[in-house]
A protein has these predicted regions:
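Aromatic-acidic/polar surface patches that form glycan- and anion
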Residues: 10-14, 49, 139, 152
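Short alpha-helical interface patches
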Residues: 15-21, 30-33, 75-76, 89-92, ...
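Short acidic/polar micro-motifs at solvent-exposed secondary-structure junctions
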Residues: 2-11, 32-58, 68-82, 120-122
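Mid-to-C-terminal secondary-structure elements
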Residues: 56-69, 80-173
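Phosphate-binding glycine-rich loops and adjacent basic patches that engage nucleotide phosphates
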Residues: 15-26, 44-54, 119-131
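Membrane-proximal extracellular/periplasmic loop immediately following the first transmembrane helix
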Residues: 1-40, 142-147, 157-162
Length: 173
């Protein structure tokens, strides 16, 4: 007999680590800190599970996400606006504009301020909405993911070894 324990737990990194890595490793060209959170969406008669990415403009630039319509207010700290992907906008609103419409994400009312390009469902980072990174920027708050873009010619394995050798220092400073 064998038994197993399954878990869908994810582990995160502290927000300040992205900047610290870039500042201490010239091999890193750019970075983005983000969080992807499953949310319960309520709008009109629609109730469904959606994914919200909390990120800043560096994430949009690094991942080539474009604003199709609307503004960038959803990226401002403390904003009550969100962006919706083209796919989710079509699913929820058909041919009508979602801009200015109110949605409820995990019991928090938000206004749709922009439509952005999405990745469909082919990515493990799929998302339906995007909002600001309104979280504490503390070393002991571990809930973020960090993407890094390496400079041309950098060996990722060598950089990983270098980063691992210095990692405890990065966290404990």
């Amino acid at each position: 007999d064998s038994s197993s324990i399954a878990s869908n737990r994810e582990f995160g990194l502290p927000y300040p680590l992205g900047k610290r890595l870039k500042d201490n490793h010239p091999e890193i060209e750019d970075y983005a800190v983000f969080n992807r959170i499953p949310n319960r969406l309520y709008t009109g008669n629609v109730r469904k599970e959606v994914n919200l990415i909390s990120a800043d403009s560096s994430f949009m630039n690094l991942m080539h996400i474009k604003i199709v319509a609307g503004n960038t207010h959803f990226m401002m700290k403390g904003s009550k606006e969100v962006a919706i992907t083209e796919q989710m906008a079509e699913e929820l609103y058909g041919n009508h504009s979602p801009l200015g419409k109110e949605v409820e994400l995990d019991n928090e009312k938000r206004t749709i301020g922009a439509i952005v390009t999405g990745w469909g469902k082919h990515s493990h980072l799929n998302y339906d909405f995007m909002g600001d990174l309104n979280y504490p920027e503390m070393w002991d708050f571990h809930m973020f993911r960090i993407l890094i873009k390496l400079r041309e010619g950098v060996n990722p394995d060598e950089l990983q070894q270098k980063m691992n050798a210095n990692f405890p220092k990065e966290i404990t400073d």
